[in-house]
């Protein structure tokens, strides 16, 4: 029987799940439970040509897992009869010591709970998903795959913050980086697409989704990335601020009377594109820029301009770090689907060797493709990320 892996990605209010054949790369089923804990919870699963949906309230992550398993049964893909060999879990933060795909036991779950302060939006729901899945599949191996793993060996100059070194060492403060599974997968796919050795390429990878990060990759090894100790640093994101002067936080605490928890919530949930433009969906943002009322239009335009400005700054910085860049890759929801973001991120860079083909950039596609002009010294690609497949393949290597 063909072996399969169930991959779980537990968010703060959602559970994504996918059943994959790691050997062939085929996705057998793909689903999501959304708005966990709300009255408007919904769940859906696509399995082959069948789509199954549910709309009843899902109170917590354990219930979300039960809902997911029920969807598989309803779609005729009972998890007990599909050759399931492992369950893979995306875990955002592995801290200083966890940077390899790791078999999950009770001690590891306790360790992941202790790392919650480093990724408060991501690690706690991952632990909930792990606990529920281990209860549902006690006889299967469960494997944690860490977002931070790919960036574990960043050069010291990139990983080190210029703060008191004793404090950094005592509290393991460094640039950890995130979306590592995606950055690694996409950079490897770029080499395959171009049919050249990964070791020969210098790349800038732009993972632009609700969370967003950039990386500079030389010969298959990352030399810098935009996210830091936590997933809040770097690019402007859907609800996260990205780079911000630390003095702003001290000012808000000391002068505005905000608590640490209030500041953290503001930075994570009420900042970024939503904080400036009131919306995280770029399709809506573009609509407001084109046809919203004056206030909505101005706010949306500012949010978009700040987003693009920050993105261009990081691209420029990484061009300087790499010296020369063979490939720039766009991936994730915004990177794969928003032609305007790609155009504006790279406009005016012809003298730096980066030229887009307007027609190719505007042409939608769900497969890897080149969008740079034939005359462009730097190749620009759009490559769909597939973190779930990368996690599934990491699982079978461990077990």
UniProtKB/Swiss-Prot annotation:
Listed name of the protein: Acetate kinase
Binding site for ATP: 16, 207-211, 281-283, 333-337
Cofactor note: Mg(2+). Can also accept Mn(2+).
Gene: ackA
Presence of the UniProt keyword RNA-binding in the record: no
Pathway assigned to this chain's UniProt record: Metabolic intermediate biosynthesis; acetyl-CoA biosynthesis; acetyl-CoA from acetate: step 1/2
Positions bound to substrate: 90
Xref: SUPFAM superfamilies: Actin-like ATPase domain
Major enzyme class: transferase
Record-listed E.C. numbers: 2.7.2.1
GO CC, one annotated term: cytoplasm
Reactions mediated catalytically: acetate + ATP = acetyl phosphate + ADP
Presence of keyword Cell inner membrane: no
Site features described as Transition state stabilizer, chain residue numbers: 179, 240
Active site: 147 (proton donor/acceptor)
Record note on quaternary structure: Homodimer.
Alphabetical UniProt keywords: ATP-binding, Cytoplasm, Kinase, Magnesium, Metal-binding, Nucleotide-binding, Transferase
Residue sites binding Mg(2+) per the record: 9, 387
Any single GO BP term: acetyl-CoA biosynthetic process
Alphabetized InterPro entries for the sequence: Ac/propionate_kinase, Aliphatic_acid_kin_short-chain, Aliphatic_acid_kinase_CS, ATPase_NBD
Cofactor: Mg(2+); Mn(2+)
Pfam families linked to this entry: Acetate_kinase
